[in-house]
Amino acid sequence: MKNKLPPFIEIYRALIATPSISATEEALDQSNADLITLLADWFKDLGFNVEVQPVPGTRNKFNMLASIGQGAGGLLLAGHTDTVPFDDGRWTRDPFTLTEHDGKLYGLGTADMKGFFAFILDALRDVDVTKLKKPLYILATADEETSMAGARYFAETTALRPDCAIIGEPTSLQPVRAHKGHISNAIRIQGQSGHSSDPARGVNAIELMHDAIGHILQLRDNLKERYHYEAFTVPYPTLNLGHIHGGDASNRICACCELHMDIRPLPGMTFNELNGLLNDALAPVSERWPGRLTVDELHPPIPGYECPPNHQLVEVVEKLLGAKTEVVNYCTEAPFIQTLCPTLVLGPGSINQAHQPDEYLETRFIKPTRELIIQVIHHFCWH
């Protein structure tokens, strides 16, 4: 039972020492099976029922759901098990060895966000789970850093409907109730190659893309004018042109040009709406040059997310922390968990440490995080 659990710092150390990198590049991508096994064993030791769920379409990735208590509702504490890859040349410490120095715990995943599971396990030492009046669930997901496949699949397949959920991403213990989404597309134009000495015998894809970009930039301006959410520091949907490539020689008519772009929609904007706006913007080019322009997703889209500001979860957490909820521009798994129940993003560590060399979590977060976890379990599972 509880006395089987290693000390907090040893749990943390074991999590960091177990690599679980997710990457779109197969050579860097790793299974999270070993980490899931670690977590599953610890939660079983605490008396939880544990289910391990293979995630389809991934390279041997798994979700874990640990549950205890009976009845409907309850609380879900969630987080992802994977980390981003690391740049060996920029780290001054071993990313897989937990190192404590000057009030900081260094290691890959200390803040983002394997460490959150160490906080949950440690807090449960002081919770009598036999007295829960509502269930407590712990969800550990796969591939948040790439496709969010774990959270997507869990949300699509589970019958659970907790009263509320908290995702322990690093927010410096400032509660987050909304964020923008993310859509990334490849705009591809197929021209007709030819010698540059006779332009009429070809179709220059770069010139067509130049025309398309003009329409896309007009869409960017329209998004800024039509949609507003003043709580965001950037209070409108953003559109960015991030990458372009076309042609292969100065004396050849360009046969193909490809542009990568993204849109970060506000909460409430649908993918159908956004895709319609993009297709409408590009319609003049498509109509003039039939069959030459295509639009494809680069990554599965992430919707915007918002927890109602007057929900009990928001009121309880704001009261416990003495802090108002915030909105942020980055993305999390919250849109998918929010389909099950009202969800907040709230956890130890700073988002500024996410994806950084020499990632760390400040030890000043240890005590308040532990106390907060105990308090929310008491509030949502004991009453």
From Swiss-Prot:
Enzyme Commission number: 3.5.1.16
Coiled coil spans: none
Cofactor binding notes: Binds 2 Zn(2+) or Co(2+) ions per subunit.
BP term (GO), one: L-arginine biosynthetic process
Keyword annotations of the record: Amino-acid biosynthesis, Arginine biosynthesis, Cobalt, Cytoplasm, Hydrolase, Metal-binding, Zinc
CDD domains: M20_ArgE
Single GO MF descriptor: acetylornithine deacetylase activity
Main location group: cytoplasm
Name the record gives this protein: Acetylornithine deacetylase
Organism of origin: Shigella boydii serotype 18 (strain CDC 3083-94 / BS512)
Lineage: Bacteria, Pseudomonadati, Pseudomonadota, Gammaproteobacteria, Enterobacterales
Gene from which the chain derives: argE
